[in-house]
Amino acid sequence: TSNKETENVKPDDGGKETEEELQKRLIHLTTVQPVVLFMKGNRESPQCGFSRKSSEALTNAGITYGTFDILSDENVRQGLKVFSDWPTYPQLYLNGELAGGNDIILEMAADGTLKTECEQAIEKWTKAKTERTNKRIESILAQSKDILLFMKGSPNEPKCGFSSKVVNALNETGEEYDTFDILKDDEIRQGMKVYSDWPT
């Protein structure tokens, strides 16, 4: 994962989301990255001392983590208190599970468990994501003809010279084949590199 903030998904209807929609969004926000700190402000500009201390503890431990500015979204700010049964901020989530607030984060930093638990969460999240991606790849392969070309673009509109050359070569064989446009699905694009152990 990157050190970018987690995406701040807004409802399409100007903030009037149902409880069910908010619940789904909270699940998404707490699991979109393995380590997420819900805080006032962001790591560059914390808006309270507790948020600053928690963010610094994660940064000082060398943890890759996302943040979500609860001041930017009142639905999340209020909804997460109920979701987590935790009334204050910041709140640290590891793989969708509440690890604790500022006091717990600082205790974990002091005894060394913050780094360990965050690293374990990252490892578990990455493994689960790889497994999900591999299942998607296997499903795509199972539904395709004997020949499947993962390419940039489509046979009629290849988006790179290499894809164009392979399409021309396949067309010359007269064999039927399917294609998958990797430019439309970055998860598959990156996952195929690992799945096939081939970087390009």
Language-model features and meaning:
Residues 1-36, 116-144, 148:
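N-terminal leader/targeting and pre-domain segments
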Residues 26-64, 138-176:
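Local sequence-structure signature of Cys/Sec-based thiol-disulfide redox active-site neighborhoods
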Residues 44-47, 76-77, 107, 156-159, ...:
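Eukaryotic short linear interaction motifs
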Residues 1, 88-104, 200:
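A short, hydrophobic beta-strand/beta-hairpin element that forms part of a small beta-sheet core
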Residues 59, 63-77, 175-189:
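Thiol-based oxidoreductase modules, predominantly thioredoxin-like and allied folds used
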Residues 22-25, 76-80, 133-136, 188-193:
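Eukaryotic intrinsically disordered and solvent-exposed regulatory patches
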Residues 82-88, 194-199:
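Thiol/disulfide oxidoreductase modules built on the thioredoxin-like
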Residues 94-123:
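Non-catalytic, surface beta->alpha helical segment in thiol-disulfide oxidoreductase systems
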